[in-house]
């Protein structure tokens, strides 16, 4: 069977059960922490696929990766996945669950990169504008990237607006080099 198909089935089953028990938000938080753990700690994947690491140790690792206090449904789900020897699919399951949750709750991720730190009033104003435009709840993350020189880079779902000085200067340079 396909990795995506199996992962999707596990994620959909977990989402359905969490929704029935009205714990989908709590499981969402735990799955976000798990997904972040996989991206920040590449060794976690290796530890899960290592046959020398016992199942109870893997449970401890995944519980710690889920956050300080994980919900019972998350813990039971982790035990189920490990019992069926599907631990290598956990990163995919986490990402699919997060996607299902955001789709259900109409949450749009927005990434706002600037060359210098922006005050909270500007972020709040932008968040309100985007909420009105999209009709969705906005999950906002802002990052400072000095290499932009000035301006900003905004990513909303699959759309990207690059109004950075670095990009504008690169485009001017490319244009000048082509017209020699």
UniProtKB/Swiss-Prot annotation:
Q: How does it sit in the membrane?
A: Peripheral membrane protein
Q: Which GO terms describe its molecular function?
A: proton-transporting ATP synthase activity, rotational mechanism
What are the subcellular locations of this protein?
A: Cell inner membrane
Alphabetized, the UniProt keywords read:
ATP synthesis, Cell inner membrane, Cell membrane, CF(1), Hydrogen ion transport, Ion transport, Membrane, Transport
Q: What single Pfam family name could you report for this chain, choosing any that match?
A: OSCP
Q: Which GO terms describe its cellular component?
A: plasma membrane; proton-transporting ATP synthase complex
What family is it from?
Belongs to the ATPase delta chain family.
Could you describe the subunit structure of this protein? Answer: F-type ATPases have 2 components, F(1) - the catalytic core - and F(0) - the membrane proton channel. F(1) has five subunits: alpha(3), beta(3), gamma(1), delta(1), epsilon(1). F(0) has three main subunits: a(1), b(2) and c(10-14). The alpha and beta chains form an alternating ring which encloses part of the gamma chain. F(1) is attached to F(0) by a central stalk formed by the gamma and epsilon chains, while a peripheral stalk is formed by the delta and b chains.
Q: What does this protein do?
A: F(1)F(0) ATP synthase produces ATP from ADP in the presence of a proton or sodium gradient. F-type ATPases consist of two structural domains, F(1) containing the extramembraneous catalytic core and F(0) containing the membrane proton channel, linked together by a central stalk and a peripheral stalk. During catalysis, ATP synthesis in the catalytic domain of F(1) is coupled via a rotary mechanism of the central stalk subunits to proton translocation. This protein is part of the stalk that links CF(0) to CF(1). It either transmits conformational changes from CF(0) to CF(1) or is implicated in proton conduction.
The name under which this protein is listed is: ATP synthase subunit delta
What is the organism of origin for this protein?
A: Parabacteroides distasonis (strain ATCC 8503 / DSM 20701 / CIP 104284 / JCM 5825 / NCTC 11152)
């Amino acid at each position: 069977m396909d990795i995506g198909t199996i992962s999707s089935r596990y994620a959909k089953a977990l989402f359905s059960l969490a929704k029935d028990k009205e714990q989908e938000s709590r499981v969402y938080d735990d799955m976000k922490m798990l997904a972040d753990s996989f991206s920040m700690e590449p060794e976690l994947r290796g530890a899960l696929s290592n046959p020398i690491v016992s199942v109870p140790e893997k449970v401890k690792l995944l519980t710690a990766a889920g956050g300080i206090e994980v919900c019972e449904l998350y813990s039971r789900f982790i035990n189920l996945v490990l019992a069926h020897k599907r631990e290598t699919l956990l990163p995919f399951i986490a990402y699919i669950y997060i996607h299902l949750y955001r789709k259900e709750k109409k949450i749009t991720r927005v990434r706002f990169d600037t060359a210098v730190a922006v005050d909270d009033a500007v972020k709040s104003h932008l968040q309100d504008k985007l909420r009105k435009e999209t009709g969705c709840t906005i999950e906002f993350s802002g990052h400072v990237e000095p290499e932009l020189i000035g301006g900003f880079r905004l990513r909303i779902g699959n759309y990207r607006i690059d109004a950075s000085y670095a990009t504008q200067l690169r485009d001017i340079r490319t244009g000048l080099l082509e017209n020699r």
